[in-house]
Every structure is written in C-alpha cells, then in structure tokens.
C-alpha cells in the first residue's frame, strides 16, 4: 500500500511545517505521512513484525542478528567499537537496498524514513537517499512517536463516527453482509479481517496467525482514518476480544452504544454458510476435534463424545446444527442482549438465499 493516497489524514492530527535539515531533507511528524509516496521502515525484521506503519516497506539497516551483535559490543566492549562495526553493517545494507529495492524509483519519488526513535538508523538511510537526489522525510521521534499517536487517536477517533452494529446469530452471514456493504460503497470496519480471526472458539484461520496487539491497533487506526464522519460506519457486533486480541476500549464503547441492524437466516441456511466458511475443519477433522475439547468444561464428556462421533461419521450438517442450538445461539444471544441495548429496536434483514445477489440486495436496503 504505497502512494500519496495510502493514508487519509485523521481529523485528530494537525500537520506542522516540516523542519528542514537541508534542501530536500526534512524532519516531519506523523501528521505528514500523507505527503510522501512511500514509508520506509529501517528497523530490524523483528521490530517490523511486531508493529509498523501500515503499508510501510521493510528495509532493515541492521538485521535482528546484526542489531544484537552491535548491542553486545556496545555493552561488553565499548560504544566506539559498536559504532564502528554498526556503521560498516549499515553501509553495506543501505548499498544493498539501493541496488535491490530503490533502483527503479523515479527522480520525483518522495520517501519517508523511520526507525525506533528517529535517530541514527533512519538518519543514515535518509542522508544517502537525499544525496542521490530524492526529497526525503525523516519521522521525528520515529516509531515511538508514531505509536504514541496511534494510542491517542484510538481514544478519540471512534467517538467521531456514526456506528451501525451488524448483529445476527452465528452463520447468518454478518461477514458476507459487511463485504456487500463495502462493495456497494458503504463504510465498513471489518475487525475480524484485521484480527485474522472469526471471533469464536473455532474462529482461528488456518495457516494465518493473528497479528500482535500493537499491529492490530495500527490496522484499526489506519482503517478509522479513512472514514468520513458524515456517513455511517458498519461494524460487526463484537465483544471486547477477537481471539487473543483486545478491541480498543473507546471503539468497544462506541459499538455497544450504537444502533443495530440484525440479519436473520433459517438454521439450514446458516449450516450451509458455516460449512462453506469453515471448510478447513471438514478437510482436517482432527483439528476440529481438538478445538471442541475446549468446551468440555461447559458441556461435559458425553456431549464432547457425541460431537466426536458426528465428526468421525462426517455428519457435518447434524454436527453444525447441534453446535448452533446448544452452544453458539445461547452464547451469542446472551452477549448481544447484554452489550447492545438497542438490539430490541433494530430493523431486521431476512436472508432469502445465501447468494451474492441476495447479500447485495440487503446491503442496498441498509444503505438506502
């Protein structure tokens, strides 16, 4: 996600004039992210993996191992030796990035470079890119300043929008409706997509781990910055956690206080939708059996063994319906009634068929 339109400025941020170090080289703030064509993160791979500005390009000037080596030299030998070795490593890595990552950038390319605190790592690459002839920004305060801004904005931004919570029993098609709303031009915050989790005991996605808490917050922050306060923002009715990730408190409060819309579908349609969405459990029944063990404390061994027998017999419709009636429907109903006081007054959308055309019809009905 590069280009000047990759970030839409948040109302909470007020851009300050850039502090020029030299002609074509400036120290800039988080508010000025939109002024640059590409964001370049020069921290190590490990730092980048934990969290980064969404859309940033990872170009470490010190790898995980190199950073550890320099740190050890700094503590055990001397700062001078550490800086000498570090400078050689940084120079070699910058040369490699110029050859492999930046060789095709045009003359008018405008990169923004950042590191942990806006110091020597980002300064080294910024100076070299500036010497090449590009107009370069170095993020003041680095990642730490960015992280502070994210946390501050996540308190304020959720209060600025007109939220609409999409409710409905498990398998009713809430995620499909959100995708249809977005395709029809609606504003949508898909928290489960950002969290890489469907929000239940069976909600983890195959071969796709959840992001870190910090990365999740960055993704939410970036999504919120795209929205206009003049139009509603649709979000699936969530609790405080999605998998292992915590939804920001201000966003939870805004969702729970919002008007709701409820999508309804008969049990057979819900079973069909769930079988399609959770097909990985049909192809890997052992994984499903292991997940269901988490519910043994709630339902006892007899129920778990019944579900195991249905899995072994590949009686997927019967298993899915029993899980809905016994576990998911009561749990979801209790949670939504507790957290969404406007639920009883919410308009109902009745799903006639689990087709793209039907979800488009319901989305258009919402947006009308």
For each predicted feature, which ranges?
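Glycine-rich phosphate-binding P-loop
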Residues: 120-121, 162-182
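Flexible, polar/low-complexity N-terminal or interdomain linker segments that lie immediately upstream
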Residues: 1-54, 82, 151-158, 163-167
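Conserved NTP phosphate-binding and transfer environment spanning the P-loop NTPase/kinase superfamily
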Residues: 254-260, 264-368
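A short glycine-rich beta-strand->turn/loop micro-motif centered on a GG-aromatic cluster
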Residues: 134-148, 190-195
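Positively charged, proline/Ser/Thr-rich regional signature most characteristic
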Residues: 33-106
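A conserved segment at the C-terminal end of the G1
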Residues: 126-129, 175-187
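Conserved nucleotide-sensing/catalytic segment adjacent to the nucleotide-binding pocket
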Residues: 184-254
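Catalytic cysteine-centered active loop of the rhodanese-like fold, especially the PTP/DSP P-loop
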Residues: 85-140
